[in-house]
Amino acid sequence: MAHKKLLNIRELMETLFTQGLITPSQMKRIASKLEKPAEESKDPLYIRILSGVGAWVGALFLILFLGISHLLRSDTSGIVFGVLFLAGGIVISRASKTTFLNQLSLALVFSGNILFLMGSVKLFQVFRTFNLSTLIIAHTLVVAVAYPFFSNSIYRFLAPTALVTLITLWILDEKVFFLIHFLIAVEMLFAGIMLLLKKPKASLTPLIYSAAIMLPLTILFMNLTQVEIGRGLGRWGEAFREPLWPSSLLLTAGLIYLYFRLAGGLKQIRNDWMILAVLATILLGVFTTPGVLVAIGLLVIGYSFDDHTLTGLSYLFLTCFLVLFYYALNINLAHKSLVIAGSGVVLLLTRWVLGHMRFERVNR
């Protein structure tokens, strides 16, 4: 009886590539995944969340202690203590990796960041030139200095997130609402560049997840202002009425580019499934909220890179945006039910068509 030849991984990938079942970019991604050394075990997500909450509470008590001790009386004391706390936290984190000292360093950096912002506010109030742009500049300066030297992933995630939040608040406070689309464009480009890096450094991982979360959150806020729920946001929700179509146009183009980038280039336009994906994306961009496009983009990247965190985020945001989309439809309840049922049928039909096409291709 003849023995079958056993293929190694490289030969198997070459065979699949010859049969047209995988693309060169997928081969590179698989190879880099196999060659990547095993990472050190990290704390579970809930442990890191609890650690961040504990450090935040500790930072508040440190600031409260300074206030009670009357050490923040002068106009520059906040900046001075902020710099000292930031430097102390960075030195402690680089000197020792024990749990207690890591927690202490995180609390010091949190409190130093807050104190630096408070000191900047107090200093600029003396010159009567304070506005939210002062906080943005001060926080950007702190993040630019602390991020490379302070390796705590919790701070590296929260600091950029806070920066985008401050920029959004500035847009609302200054009533330059059209800039929200420029912010979304910058977030989309930045998130795309970060998520599509071939071999991202470990130090960039928190920044990548921060970008992946802030883009849909910005669009979610913009969506909320378009419906009755937005009235509960106060004067910002009542004044903010920016149309969604510019962001939809940007995100549609970005999502189509993502398809071709992951599939191996423009040559894939000849494939039936790519034509179907592009047409479906254009229709979604025309008829739905831009948040659905972002959720689909996260879902595609999550599946492509086997990132369960991004996949989970995509499902979460997709649910939120679909609920908002159907809630905002200006039709009666019966028609909404028909639209939801029809959407489900279309999705099931699309899945069946793609599965049938893939089955035929494998058989060939």
Describe each region flagged by the PLM.
Residues A2-R364:
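Alpha-helical multi-pass membrane segments and their bilayer interfacial helix-loop junctions
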